[in-house]
Amino acid sequence: MSDSNLDEVLVLIPARMASTRLPGKPLADICGLPMIVQVAMRAKEAAIGRVVVAVDDQQVFDAVSAAGFDVVMTSSDHQSGSDRIFEALTKVDPDGKAKFIVNVQGDLPTIDPQTVRAALRPLENEAVDIGTLTTEIDDEDDKTAPHIVKIVGSPVSDTRLHALYFTRATAPHGKGPLYHHIGLYAYRRAALERFVSLGPSTLERRESLEQLRALEAGMRIDVEIVDTVPLGVDTPADLEKARRILSARTG
């Protein structure tokens, strides 16, 4: 998207305090700042539009606000990040000025701003409802690991796939690259509105993959190919790794 589209793009970052593996995750200190603030900084550095953090806890709200970022309180009852960002969207942009919504997960403090920008590129095609990201799988263990979500897609260019399916299985069969899905999404506003109105689908429940709801409803998802998977912070070990990465960048 060009600079003229900045007013049309809203970057929303959902943050939940209830993490079983890393309690209080949004407020975990990384180089002197809460993790959620580090994520907001990366999103701001992407320079694609307004950045708003969607929270469910007053401590997180206060920390984000103190850092100078826009923040909105949302319900703690949401079952998914998509539901949380939709509530945030209706609160911060009730007039519908934002045409494109980018959902950046709140546990990606080291993400490259260029990776955030890449999620928007598929929406340059008017036929695409949702843009997301992938990278080719190099590690042999990752090719069969159920926690690594794979994309079955048809190439539309050297750097983009048209998603046909997402699965935890090893797919597609046969020779050729396998692709690791990166859960960062860019939606057309109408697509997000439709998505949250649909409710969980059959394949979504079976694979525990929310994006299958869109495919089952006939929505088009295109996938930009990027170089690396951003570090998601889910455990204390991930947190230490994130601290080392950002310390090296700032040191």
Swiss-Prot record:
Superkingdom assignment: Bacteria
Gene3D superfamilies: Spore Coat Polysaccharide Biosynthesis Protein SpsA, Chain A (3.90.550.10)
Cystine residue pairs: none
GO CC field: cytosol
Enzyme class name: transferase
Alphabetized InterPro entries for the sequence: Cytidylyl_trans, KdsB, Nucleotide-diphossugar_trans
Keywords: Cytoplasm, Lipopolysaccharide biosynthesis, Nucleotidyltransferase, Transferase
UniProt record, GO biological process: CMP-keto-3-deoxy-D-manno-octulosonic acid biosynthetic process; lipopolysaccharide biosynthetic process
Reaction equations catalysed: 3-deoxy-alpha-D-manno-oct-2-ulosonate + CTP = CMP-3-deoxy-beta-D-manno-octulosonate + diphosphate
Pfam families referenced in this protein's UniProt entry, alphabetically: CTP_transf_3
Cellular compartment(s): Cytoplasm
Annotated family: Belongs to the KdsB family.
Role according to the record: Activates KDO (a required 8-carbon sugar) for incorporation into bacterial lipopolysaccharide in Gram-negative bacteria.
UniProt protein name: 3-deoxy-manno-octulosonate cytidylyltransferase
Organism, as annotated: Rhizobium etli (strain CIAT 652)
